[in-house]
From Swiss-Prot:
Composition-biased stretches (Polar residues): 242-253
Molecular function per GO: GTP binding; GTPase activity
Name listed for the protein in its UniProt record: Small GTPase-like protein LIP2
Record SUPFAM superfamilies: P-loop containing nucleoside triphosphate hydrolases
Swiss-Prot/TrEMBL keywords: GTP-binding, Nucleotide-binding
Organism field: Arabidopsis thaliana
Annotated positions binding GTP: 29-36, 90-94, 160-163
Length: 333
């Protein structure tokens, strides 16, 4: 019997897989620029002929492995190579979802801005998208300084429909946001000089990344490096440059997405009176306990004449029957 218990314990230990991490990346831009085609190309590795219109938001998941150096992390420990899931949140750019898009702007690790190379207005509107995400979004491991519109997380600008723009004679569209993205990424030092984007000579230096999702043409290596950088920022903060470096970043403590406590619970936990006495001063609300029934329910106060002194019914009847005259015999009227 003891042998089978030890054998079962060993099998359970071997079956336990290392924890998988996850990062969340928003994909935003005007309606019709090809965000859904981009997400499908990144996740599936192939183009989609007729993508359907996005209703609210759709999520695509990309699996990646990240090989950590010998330095250990405060969040993930163990083997040097781990599995990670990149959540690509494709947010609809239609105006009908403008009032509810902020529901999807939570726990953001990075942003992908997409514009149409054949329509210059879609690139000009990226500044509006950056401001919308910055104002209404909630970010994980924000940067010390913000990008365009105050965006506090890393981002990349991608120009789609390069095939259509080439046929129409449209050059790589110019815009202030892409130039600001290039200067901001270089200033923050998010990537070493050897890894700066774009990685191909066919990409002009002031346009960002160019792709043609319909023809399944995009820089897979560049996007993979972006995702690895976001993973490193959230889970392996000790790999980032030291504060003494010119390209250093100051990081806020990252929060796991699988934590079950709400913001209200965290507030009560921080405001406990003593840390040592967890039983007496634990102010976390007990959500799993039912409220005890009241033995003597209190009657609600009367809204009318609650300040007037109350009389017994018998005295009122005697007064009404005697026409207001007292029945005491010792009083001479």
């Amino acid at each position: 019997m003891r042998f089978w218990r030890e054998r079962g314990r060993e099998n359970k230990e071997h079956m336990v897989a290392p924890l998988c991490g996850q990062i969340r990346v928003l994909v935003v831009g005007d309606s019709g620029v090809g965000k859904s085609s981009l997400v499908h190309l990144i996740v599936k590795g192939s183009s989609i002929v007729r993508p359907s219109q996005t209703i609210g938001c759709t999520v695509g998941v990309k699996h990646l492995t990240y090989a950590s150096p010998a330095s250990s992390s405060s969040i993930i420990k163990g083997d040097s190579e781990r599995d990670f899931f990149v959540e690509l949140w494709d947010v609809s750019g239609h105006e009908r979802y403008k009032d509810c898009r902020s529901l999807f702007y939570s726990q953001i690790n990075g942003v992908i801005f997409v514009h149409d190379l054949s329509q210059r207005t879609t690139k000009t509107n990226l500044q509006k998208w950056a401001g919308e995400v910055s104002v209404t979004g909630e970010f994980s491991a924000p940067l010390s300084s913000g990008g365009p519109g105050g965006l506090p997380v890393p981002y990349i600008v991608i120009g789609n429909k390069a095939d259509i723009a080439a046929k129409g004679g449209t050059n790589g569209s110019s815009g202030n946001l892409v130039d600001a993205a290039r200067h901001w990424v270089e200033k923050q030092g998010l990537l070493p000089h050897s890894d700066e984007l774009p990685l191909s000579e066919s990409f002009p230096s002031n346009v960002g990344l160019i792709m043609a999702a319909k023809e399944a043409r995009y820089d897979k290596e560049a996007l993979t490096k972006i995702f690895h950088m976001l993973i490193r920022r959230r889970y392996f903060s000790d790999e980032l440059p030291s504060p003494s470096s010119a390209w250093s970043l100051s990081h806020a403590p990252s929060q796991r997405l699988d934590e079950g406590t709400s913001d209200e619970d965290q507030f009560y936990k921080r405001t406990s009176l003593r840390e040592g006495d967890a039983y007496k001063y634990n102010t976390l609300p007990q959500h799993n306990l039912m409220q005890s029934p009241t033995l003597y329910p209190q009657q609600p106060p009367d809204r009318y004449n609650y300040a007037i002194p109350r009389f017994s019914l018998s005295s009122v009847e005697e007064t009404s029957n005697g026409n207001g005259r007292s029945k005491r015999m010792d009083i001479n009227v």
